[in-house]
């Protein structure tokens, strides 16, 4: 969640940044009104508690002197009832504030360009030149069906739309891609973690998926358990230290994690209906870092380089895009997307998103560290795909396709097959 004390002293600046993130103009005002109400209620409770303490001392002194404390006893009883009532008022004010604050997105960094949507994202640089073909390149779904790698019809038969069956050499290549990504990320100092695919509500709250994006999540709900399927292993890797206080010496934490991801893709009707670009179930290899606040910018650059170098090692042309304010995710203060060239579509498509969430997720998940002076401080959290597995398979198929419809295997993957 956002820092309410900081917002209070920089209202106009932060309100402008939230509006740039397509948040309604009155949201921040409503949030601060609820915050002021809570502070007022807490002050009233504190005053009543102080009065109770003072009166209790007076009562004790009178009793020691064996005096008449009848009236004072009545006052203490009345004030105790007031404290109970005021405590309930404070609790209700806290719930009201949390409900509002939990749906307010992170504040954008100063260097994030203002813009309405993805059309106003800014290209930072392009890496490698797209391949030139002496024939009309095909899209991955046409190549995959012809080779017997991708079976969309049976994927639909098994699970419905936006599910794909991968088989034969396609499945082997998919597995090779995963193992290569994990090895590459480990070579950059990221520790491999294997984490659950089902999580509790509070874990999704920690990374910002709940409560705002509940409709895009799959839930397993029965008599035995009530858990959500993860939309990304960012959720589990970031929350690994949920509610904990780390020592400064433990930072930075650098995780890489492979997982299946599950998303309803609400609002994407009609988009990418053919092929593997947009699926309800897909695979990713994720990077997650937990750092001191002063180190997160350097870590952000390191994570962007890791994912970009991974694409480069596969010989895949791509570009780095700075997301504008209107295209940023809920928890992100800053994001760079990596978009890979797909010759079959004759365009660049997102294959990785690297985000710095500052202390936004840490505040929600209560992840802190104890600094050298013994003070507990919030960490910064960062996450990014390195890479989306299915889209990497798509990119290899389209970029390495031959005139006869066969697919050449990138050299770095040969030992993994």
UniProtKB/Swiss-Prot annotation:
It catalyses: tRNA(Ser) + L-serine + ATP = L-seryl-tRNA(Ser) + AMP + diphosphate + H(+); tRNA(Sec) + L-serine + ATP = L-seryl-tRNA(Sec) + AMP + diphosphate + H(+). Its main location: cytoplasm. It is an enzyme of class 6 (ligase). It comes from Campylobacter hominis (strain ATCC BAA-381 / DSM 21671 / CCUG 45161 / LMG 19568 / NCTC 13146 / CH001A). It holds the Pfam family Seryl_tRNA_N. Consists of two distinct domains, a catalytic core and a N-terminal extension that is involved in tRNA binding. Belongs to the class-II aminoacyl-tRNA synthetase family. Type-1 seryl-tRNA synthetase subfamily. ATP binds at residues 263-265, 350-353. Coiled coil: none annotated. The keyword Cytoplasm applies. This is Serine--tRNA ligase. Catalyzes the attachment of serine to tRNA(Ser). Is also able to aminoacylate tRNA(Sec) with serine, to form the misacylated tRNA L-seryl-tRNA(Sec), which will be further converted into selenocysteinyl-tRNA(Sec). CDD domains: SerRS_core. One of its GO terms (biological process) is selenocysteine biosynthetic process. L-serine binds at residues 232-234, 286, 385. Its EC number is 6.1.1.11. One of its GO terms (molecular function) is serine-tRNA ligase activity. GO terms for cellular component: cytoplasm. Homodimer. The tRNA molecule binds across the dimer. Pathway: Aminoacyl-tRNA biosynthesis; selenocysteinyl-tRNA(Sec) biosynthesis; L-seryl-tRNA(Sec) from L-serine and tRNA(Sec): step 1/1. It is found in: Cytoplasm. InterPro entries: aa-tRNA-synt_IIb (IPR002314), aa-tRNA-synth_II (IPR006195), aa-tRNA-synth_II/BPL/LPL (IPR045864), Ser-tRNA-ligase_type_1 (IPR002317), Ser-tRNA-synth_1_N (IPR015866), SerRS_1_N_sf (IPR042103), SerRS_core (IPR033729), tRNA-bd_arm (IPR010978). Keywords: Aminoacyl-tRNA synthetase, ATP-binding, Cytoplasm, Ligase, Nucleotide-binding, Protein biosynthesis. The gene is serS.
